[in-house]
Structures are given as structure tokens and as C-alpha cells.
Amino acid sequence: MKTYNVAIVGASGAVGQELIKGLENSFFPIKKFVPLASTRSAGKKIKAFNKDYEILETTHEVFEREKIDIAFFSAGGSVSEEFATSASKTALVVDNTSFFRLNKDVPLVVPEINAKEIFNAPLNIIANPNCSTIQMTQILNPLHLHFKIKSVIVSTYQAVSGAGNKGIESLKNELKTALECLEKDPTIDLNQVLQAGAFAYPIAFNAIAHIDTFKENGYTKEELKMLHETHKIMGVDFPISATCVRVPVLRSHSESLSIAFEKEFDLKEVYEVLKNAPSVAVCDDPSHNLYPTPLKASHTDSVFIGRLRKDLFDKKTLHGFCVADQLRVGAATNALKIALHYIKNA
């Protein structure tokens, strides 16, 4: 079997760490592993495959010098903008950032939906979709193929690790401060003691309806990503309206979905379609308190769906609640599936 030299740009970040775990736990045919990062992190040690690796600086030359075959980019859009094209001259690039997602020459891939697009990459770059988009499309696509979707309204409840290690540290530090203050004075106004860290407001004991920047139409970039990326991945144009909220959860994004179909539907058929959908786990027995939660979804590679029910007033509308580990399903696992599909079918 052919083996590959693999690089991860942003190896020390939250998604980079999940990529390493995924490579360690999969049957990925690795010949050489090269961790890459910024000048700030270069020279530091990182553990992978039961040994220590020195992080190299990301440069335009490093990919050719190290004979990289596959390069995963998870270090932010500006890094992908600067270095991905250089890497793609000698390596297949799988980019986890938003920079290339809507580029017409770069396929945007969820392998369970449009794996064939992996081989339609003239720039030798394949984009990994937004984490919230990946889990949503894995629910929408099988339903659309069976019932035909008319429109979607989605509200997200997104974990702090979606903002990387700085988001995790903000929640931990703010919770520590808040709990210490509440121990001294249970009636204290936390607005007076908590300071914003990685987010626009303190995230501890809070919910912030603000992910990415606001656009002139009142939507955030995150909300518009879910619209435009879904259209590109699924090849559809039905309306999608999103509201994205950051919540004080460490890991796994949740989404409340309201899906309007073109015709009335049978709820039993919905269950059958989703039970047979790849990477989807139906978790739905409210009488026994069985429904998706972020804790249950964390450290898994499934999109959990539950609370499935017909709208009380519109027989064509389905409601549901889906949860997935955004660091795995929404980033690392999807990227690895792209690379593995490429290797097996090239």
C-alpha cells in the first residue's frame, strides 16, 4: 500500500489536535508526519504517534522541502490565503478554514453527500465546510432526497471550542471567577465582576447571539455561511434562515431545525430515512429522556438527531434537534474522510 507524507498546519490548535488523534486512530497510511505552525509556535514540541515532534514554521517552501503529499490547513483563513496555494503545487490541500469555501474552483465537500466533487479540484485544494453546516447538511440531505425541502429555519447553540483554545480558556477562567464570587456572595451581579475574553461578552452563565462579524443585512457571517455553503454542497436553492448563538458549553454544537417540506409527510418515514442515513444516529425516545445532548455527542463521529415531531399547525413542517462534536464531525473527521476518499479512489 502506498504511504503518504502528511502535514498539519495549525497542529497545536484545537482542530489540529483532533486531526492528530484522528490520524492516530484511523488506518491512514502515513509515511511521515510534519506538524506546522506560526513562527510563535515553531520549535516547540508536540506529541503524536507516541513520540515527540518538533513543530516547523509554515513557509512557502516547507511543503516541497518535506515532500508533503497531503496538507491539512487548520490555522485560520489568513494562513490558508497565504500558504495553501504554495502547498497545493506539490500536495493535496484539505482546508478547514472559510477562505476557499465559496471559490467556484474549490469543491466544498461533505463526503456522505458529494464525495465525487473531491476529484473536481483544479486548484488541488478541497474545502472543509463550516462546522455547523456539516452537521446540518447530514440531516437535510437525506430528507431532501426523500421528501423535497421547501425551506429551513435553524437556531444554533455553539460550543466555545468552536472559537479554538482561546474560547475554551475564556469559559474556564470566567467560570472560575464567577463561582468564586458566588461562593462569597450568592446575590452578586456577575455583570460587575466578569470581563469579556474571547467573545463580545462574558460567556460564563451567558448566551451570545453573535458568531463572526455582522453584515449590513443584520445577519452574521456564520449565519450566512450556513445558507451559502449548504446551497453549494447540496446543489439546492431553498431558503435557509439561521440564528447562531454561542453558549457556555465546552464541546459539541446543537441545532434546532424547522424543516418545511413541499408536501405532507409521514413521521415514520422520517425516522426510517434518518436511521439509514450515513453518519446519523437517531436518538429519540423522550419517554425515557432519550434525546441528543452535547455531552453525549462529544468525542464521537456521529450526528445525533432527536425530538423529531410534526408542527402542531403546519402538516408539512418537521421539527428536530441535532447535536454533533464540531471538532470532529464538523472539522477533523470530515477532513480525514475527504483525504481517505481521495487516497482510496485516486
Curated annotation (Swiss-Prot):
Quote the catalytic activity from the record. Answer: L-aspartate 4-semialdehyde + phosphate + NADP(+) = 4-phospho-L-aspartate + NADPH + H(+)
The residues annotated as the active site are 131 (acyl-thioester intermediate), 253 (proton acceptor)
Q: Which UniProt keywords apply?
A: Amino-acid biosynthesis, Diaminopimelate biosynthesis, Lysine biosynthesis, Methionine biosynthesis, NADP, Oxidoreductase, Threonine biosynthesis
Q: Entry's PROSITE patterns?
A: ASD (PS01103)
Q: Which residues bind NADP(+)?
A: 12-15, 40-41, 161-162, 326
Return the CDD domains for the record. Answer: ASADH_C_bac_euk_like (cd18131), VcASADH2_like_N (cd02316)
Positions with a binding annotation for phosphate: 101, 225
Q: Which GO molecular function entries does the Swiss-Prot or TrEMBL record give?
A: aspartate-semialdehyde dehydrogenase activity; NAD binding; NADP binding; protein dimerization activity
**EC no.?**
1.2.1.11
Query: Can the keyword Amino-acid biosynthesis be found in this entry's annotation?
Result: yes
Could you say which residues bind substrate here? 158, 246
Superkingdom of this protein's organism: Bacteria
Query: Which pathway or pathways does this protein act in?
Result: Amino-acid biosynthesis; L-lysine biosynthesis via DAP pathway; (S)-tetrahydrodipicolinate from L-aspartate: step 2/4; Amino-acid biosynthesis; L-methionine biosynthesis via de novo pathway; L-homoserine from L-aspartate: step 2/3; Amino-acid biosynthesis; L-threonine biosynthesis; L-threonine from L-aspartate: step 2/5
Q: Which GO terms describe its biological process?
A: 'de novo' L-methionine biosynthetic process; diaminopimelate biosynthetic process; isoleucine biosynthetic process; lysine biosynthetic process via diaminopimelate; threonine biosynthetic process
What Pfam families would the database entry show? Semialdhyde_dh, Semialdhyde_dhC
Instruction: Give the main EC class.
Output: oxidoreductase
Record's SUPFAM superfamilies? Glyceraldehyde-3-phosphate dehydrogenase-like, C-terminal domain, NAD(P)-binding Rossmann-fold domains
Instruction: Cite the record's note on assembly.
Output: Homodimer.
Q: What does this protein do?
A: Catalyzes the NADPH-dependent formation of L-aspartate-semialdehyde (L-ASA) by the reductive dephosphorylation of L-aspartyl-4-phosphate.
Q: What family is reported?
A: Belongs to the aspartate-semialdehyde dehydrogenase family.
Protein's recorded name: Aspartate-semialdehyde dehydrogenase
Which species is the source of this protein?
Answer: Helicobacter pylori (strain ATCC 700392 / 26695) (Campylobacter pylori)
Originating gene? asd
